[in-house]
Amino acid sequence: MSDTIRIALIGATGLIGTTVIGQCIGREDVRLTGIARREMKLPRGIRMELFVAEPAKWGEVIEAIRPTALICALGTTWKKAGEEEAAFRAVDLDLVLETAQAAKKLNVERFVHVSSAGADPMSGKFYLKVKGEVERELTKMRFGRLDILRPGLLVGKREGDRRPAERFGIAAAPLGNLLLHGSYRRFRAIRADSVAQAALALAKRAARGRFVHDNDGILRAAKTLPQIEHEAT
């Protein structure tokens, strides 16, 4: 077993955050600490700490736990933001960057950010434009290691906020994936398990630099995470 790494998780209550937590059950090579705005039910068998605090206090929490790496799975949906651009930016841009700035100030070495396929600050689509702006600003912060994950449509169990179009996309994903080739491969649906595994694997890597991972890169990284044998229940 490799040395234990201390990882902070922001966005612990969302699809990727909860999946990261699930992937840490039985892992002795990861000491996970979640940071969230509300209480959440933790899965059976997980050994981790969960700090519940307002975002203004997250810097203090990061300072207290002193993680080597931070996984940022923070994000809202257009529906949860009340379909207002300012409310969406407040979470997906402002809060992400404020968290990253606090981590950088406290000398967190590695930052893993879950973005989106198609992220581009010049995009004509608001969602992808915001995601691209975040990536651009994170790159300027010069973490020792920065990994940006750009998954396509996420497939996994999400707490009751699936939009009709998103539910249809997931149902059609097997066929859609077969039709997406070349530069469009990056938009293929991908399991949340794979994204979570990749985030953990990348958080454990010490090589310095800035790296962007599309769907194929995410799947490759996920395969490098050592597997854990869970006890039968």
Go through each PLM region and give its residues.
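N-terminal Rossmann NAD(P)H-binding glycine-rich loop of SDR-like oxidoreductase domains
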Residues: 2-27
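N-terminal Rossmann-fold cofactor-binding loop
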Residues: 28, 34-39, 54
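Short loop/helix-cap segments at secondary-structure boundaries that form the rim of catalytic
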Residues: 38-47
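NAD(P)H-binding glycine-rich loop region in Rossmannoid oxidoreductase-like domains
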Residues: 48-98, 102-105
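SDR active-site strand-loop-helix element
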Residues: 10, 35, 73-74, 111-117, ...
